[in-house]
Amino acid sequence: MNATTINSLFLIGALLVGASILVSSLSSRLGIPILVIILAVGMSAGVDGGGIIFDNYPTAYLVGNLALAVILLDGGLRTRVSSFRVALWPALSLATVGVLITTGLTGMAAAWLFDLNLIQGLLIGAIVGSTDAAAVFSLLGGKGLNERVTASLEIESGSNDPMAVFLTVTLIDMLASGQTGLHWSLLTHLIREFGIGGVIGLGGGWLMLQLVNRINLATGLYPILVIAGGLVVFALTNALHGSGFLAVYLCGLVIGNRPVRSRHGILHMLDGMAWLAQIGMFLVLGLLVTPHDLLPIALPALGLALWMILFARPLSVLVGLLPFKAFHGREKAFISWVGLRGAVPIILAVFPLMAGLPNAQLYFNLAFFIVLVSLLVQGTSLPWVAKLLKVTVPPEPAPISRAALEVHVTSEWELFVYKLGAEKWCIGSPLRELKMPEGTRIAALFRGQQLLHPSGSTVLEVDDLLCVIGHEHNLPALGKLFSQAPQRGLDLRFFGDFVLEGDAQLKAVAALYGLPAEGIDPDMTLGHFIAQKVGGAPIVGDQVEWNNTHWTVAVMDGNKIGKVGVRFPEGSRPGPGLFL
């Protein structure tokens, strides 16, 4: 490879990445997932488009694994451990039992549609059996889904790769050696994958956390150190025959949920690196496929994709979530629909090619086709389906910007900036009348281009920029303080006619509204009663019906219900609505 060739690679690579970024702006306008657009850019530059010939499967495997490691590290850093209280066990059930059922049902259909033996069909099922972290993290962000649904899908996508990889590798070995039956020893291999991945991921995350917090470096080096550490965890786990994907996700989870030096710098850098990883990975996968090879298998492949989307995935979710009573039918239906496939199936489809199996090209083309259908059908319809199934909750007001204040190595102080519109409650009020959350301070106030020194008598005006020092847990209270005035719109329609305190005595609430109170524990609070009715860990948006009245969890205070919205039957309880 000479200098001219290297320079050409730089030029073509930069043009493709730049084109992907520019064209991605069409994503929100057309309602098409950005990952599909990036795939399309890669395909259009490939054999049937721009003429770039790329058939180096080992390189694609390398790029795919590297990209997924970065994406999962970033996903782990942004996943809150608090979400585990509502979704850990359901997600693990989907990541194991769910993948097995999807693999089996999809494999049997593939064997029938493409005239393959059962083991070959099951290999196809295993390749496309897991949801994809890159697709899930990319498409779920900012959709306003409730915590139970979001956490279940994100944890599932971050933890179901070990099962899919295990099944794929096992079935490839069986086909290569001519085996036709399964052995119980395979179960120990699966447990080893999860066990080694879990131990090294958690241990490596803890070691990286100690290292980052104890060593003094230039600010820009901390994100690079975290990425390097994550890749060490990923590679070491793979070398010990564990699940590198699970390990790097858990490594990010440990670092992201503890006080860590330069948190915002790490998150900002990882955000850019995760986007670059997604773009590079889907460009390479788009270049790898030959579009005209997909045409002969289009109809049976479409049938297989629809079978998986409409039957295999819903049945696997139904069985996987059967023990968990907190999941409503609407939530199960949405989780069934968002079985997003992405880069992982395509990367797994490279395994048979590298092993030299018969029909390996068919497996790859099928995986690519199913991913394309999944992203186009499920990814494009995701916002519409979320609204149809009512799994969204009103968004919490957020500051227009936030930045870390590195007061101490593990300092979690942040600076939040709010812009006050005409509809804000606090306009016209002096600062002394604001009931600021405990532990927060107004640091500065900007009016136009002028920096004001805030005092108790300073009156807030429209378009003021207010800078507040506080912690992340202060955001809900600050959001309510500087939020828009309540409208008889989404918030009131969602939470009900009134919002009551969760620690109100249930018997007193029943007496106040004339509801039957027979058999009620006089000491039970409203929040505890609603939590019992939910049947699991409650979340904002959970709804139950009692005495022909709808009760909705409006605010969570840690693991307790803080506020409950109540909606009476139409016309039976007139009066102004309240939203706190």
From Swiss-Prot:
Segments traversing the membrane: 6-26, 34-54, 57-77, 94-114, 121-141, 162-182, 193-213, 217-237, 240-260, 269-289, 292-312, 334-354, 366-386
Pfam families according to UniProt: CorC_HlyC, Na_H_Exchanger, TrkA_C
Topological type in the membrane: Multi-pass membrane protein
Swiss-Prot/TrEMBL GO biological process terms: cell volume homeostasis
Any one annotated GO CC term: plasma membrane
Catalytic activity: K(+)(in) + H(+)(out) = K(+)(out) + H(+)(in)
Xref: PANTHER family: K(+)_H(+) ANTIPORTER NHAP2, NA(+)/H(+) ANTIPORTER 1
Record family assignment: Belongs to the monovalent cation:proton antiporter 1 (CPA1) transporter (TC 2.A.36) family. NhaP2 subfamily.
Protein name: K(+)/H(+) antiporter NhaP2
